[in-house]
């Protein structure tokens, strides 16, 4: 089958790789000059299945009000003048219940755990290198309230059989030796030893090269204007003055997926703006070993070979990609507070990207009501974590194979009806 994939981020490239490996003829189209040059370029670098969780959580609405008045708030909202933003925020609010949080987190952990397994198999098969580490993820708490609040996440981890360790402030240094110097600031931590880290942009670039060896064709610097429809199916992709045709089409354009498919299927994917800095390491003994999540500021601090990546925050501000110095200040404050002297933040590069977020946090992977149109988008802050699993899952669905995990509640159809009790539809 001839397949056109729109988007060459980590999710689009992973889809291309697994579809090509399944025997399909694949072409990837992207407006950028190469793979992973937009949202996948400088994310936090963590591969954290156990920490896969929706931003829509109990208590978040009240916290959002409090964060409006805080200098280093992890969430900010600025109206963009669209009705879609208001609808999306209302849908997110409806998912901020204990029941919905558990349901959505369970779906996300299922896909994320599977994706980690797919990544490990890929690494064993291809020996792909991307500055990866397998040192786990450590979430640190600054207050007893935060530590107690982790109980709801631990319950989901137990149900999903995800290994975890609950650490006291004195035990944190076992996982991250550099935290010994600041243990007095911390109450404890939750460690997931099965998590990994790695440079997403480097991984995507090298996976694209492996995909090319399987026959995948990449068309970069190509504008994607519209999907042409005929007879109730996609007839082609309008790219400037050219119509690109195939048998099936995959939209993996992240936040830009929504507008492209708007006339065919309504998907609640909104851009959630995030920031990162990447600083050179100056003292490895004072730097993190793997990924550390600061629960207070919702910031991830990740170790690469000779760099520290610090990423986080969420701004609901539309497609605004302006860099804000205040956000850089928050990232620098956080890493210097937990790992003083580890990296040179004055020499750090500053970046922002738009994560494609659904109101329930769960990505949209699979078929649509249009017979030959498929989606692989809406992964939010977890595109890197979920990429390989989403790609393999989509390849299985498009090849007529039974997926290794449940997939029906990951498709866009969960938003199209709220009457099917078995599917436990999302609020959208």
Swiss-Prot record:
A GO BP annotation: D-alanine catabolic process
Presence of the UniProt keyword Cytoplasm in the record: no
Encoding gene per record: dadA
Enzyme nomenclature, EC number: 1.4.99.-
GO MF term (any one): D-amino-acid dehydrogenase activity
Superkingdom of the source species: Bacteria
Organism: Burkholderia pseudomallei (strain K96243)
Function comment: Oxidative deamination of D-amino acids.
Protein name: D-amino acid dehydrogenase
UniProt record similarity statement: Belongs to the DadA oxidoreductase family.
Keywords of this entry: FAD, Flavoprotein, Oxidoreductase
